[in-house]
């Protein structure tokens, strides 16, 4: 089993990491190309870039937005993403692994902080899962992978914490380490081909929305006409929900379609 573990955190790790990086780079480049193509083909090239930049910053650093809607769920999601980013890159054992593969290293976080972040990430994964299961609106918008991913992403954290902190027999330790290594490799291999690719697309999300709205000539105008906004610009500072008696009635009430 030790040979399988070494293979998983050696050649297989380098392969899946390379696949993840190249795959995410491809997704990022194709998105940029799509934005440029939409902008080139549009007859309306007026885009409020400053507003888009502010909205992008607000989505990347959502501290002030966490309490607006579903505060507990939003805060849980924020903690989950923080743990996913920090622990894999700054846990001391992981820094050593990165050093072996990349040839250089960086400072590691304290062990106690890593343990607490690991536990918070595990708890947040459970919270996100049940937050979808128990919330009717979230269930209506969720796909099967939305329920699958929190569990898969939690496996490396559960097994890693067990290996680092629990006194177990050598056989149990090796089994946990095998699950830890191969679940992480599986995640890296899947990232570019699933919704987790949003980790590199998040900085572009508001730009995509602003530009792609005009991708099909006249599409934005037709949507605005359907909503009764033919006399208003497509992008405005204030949300239109206050003036939309029918289209946004459910949104104002905090309900969702059945």
Feature annotation, model-predicted:
Residues 1-258:
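Membrane-embedded alpha-helical bundles that constitute the cytochrome b-like, heme-associated redox core
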């Amino acid at each position: 089993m030790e040979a399988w573990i070494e293979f998983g955190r050696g050649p297989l790790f380098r392969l899946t990491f390379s696949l993840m990086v190249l795959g995410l780079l491809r997704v990022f480049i194709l998105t940029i190309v799509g934005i440029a193509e939409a902008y080139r083909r549009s007859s309306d090239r007026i885009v409020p870039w400053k507003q888009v930049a502010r909205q992008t910053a607000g989505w990347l650093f959502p501290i002030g937005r966490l309490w607006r809607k579903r505060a507990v769920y939003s805060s849980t999601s924020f903690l989950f993403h923080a743990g996913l980013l920090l622990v894999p890159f700054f846990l001391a054992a992981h820094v050593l692994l990165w050093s072996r593969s990349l040839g250089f290293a960086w400072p590691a976080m304290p062990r106690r902080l890593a343990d607490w972040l690991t536990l918070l990430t595990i708890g947040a994964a459970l919270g996100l899962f049940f937050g979808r299961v128990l919330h009717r609106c979230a269930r209506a918008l969720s796909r099967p992978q939305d329920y699958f991913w929190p569990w898969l992403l939690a496996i490396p954290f559960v097994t890693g914490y067990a290996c680092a902190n629990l006194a177990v027999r050598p056989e149990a330790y090796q089994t946990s380490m095998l699950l830890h290594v191969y679940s992480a490799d599986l995640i890296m291999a899947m990232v570019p081909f699933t919704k987790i690719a949003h980790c590199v697309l998040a900085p572009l999300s508001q730009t995509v929305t602003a530009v792609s709205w005009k991708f099909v000539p006249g599409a934005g105008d037709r949507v605005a006409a359907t909503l009764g906004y033919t006399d208003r610009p497509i992008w405005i500072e204030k949300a239109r929900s206050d003036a939309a008696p029918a289209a946004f009635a459910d949104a104002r009430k905090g309900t969702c379609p059945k």
